[in-house]
Amino acid sequence: MPRIREKGKEMKKRPLAYITAHWSDNEYENTERAAKFCRAVYDAGFSPICPLLIHSLFLRDEVPQEHKDGLDMARDYLRRSNVLVVCGSSVDEAVKNDIAMAERLRITATTLDGILTVKGQGRRDK
């Protein structure tokens, strides 16, 4: 992992990990799941980026232009990421689109369980 220096300290630079999952219609449940996924990815040594958590704070998805802007921003986050992390046990069209975009951008796509296994942390509790 690359290292950076900050005021005389050497620190590890965490790779950016874009978090995607099949989200339900329940906003509260999605927020809870997304936060748990992000924590697991963070604990594995990555800097998680989860549009669902970020955008819900300031965008109104029911406003068409804000919905479109959210999609555009999410694609920009993915372009800047080092890895796409697919979380959860099911895949929907949005996740398939994220995987296809990552492939086009030559960004590694993996699962949360894959990251945790590689990092030696075993499987995460679901």
Model-predicted regions and their roles:
Residues 1-126:
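Catalytic phosphate/metal-binding cores of nucleic-acid and nucleotide-processing enzymes, i.e., regions
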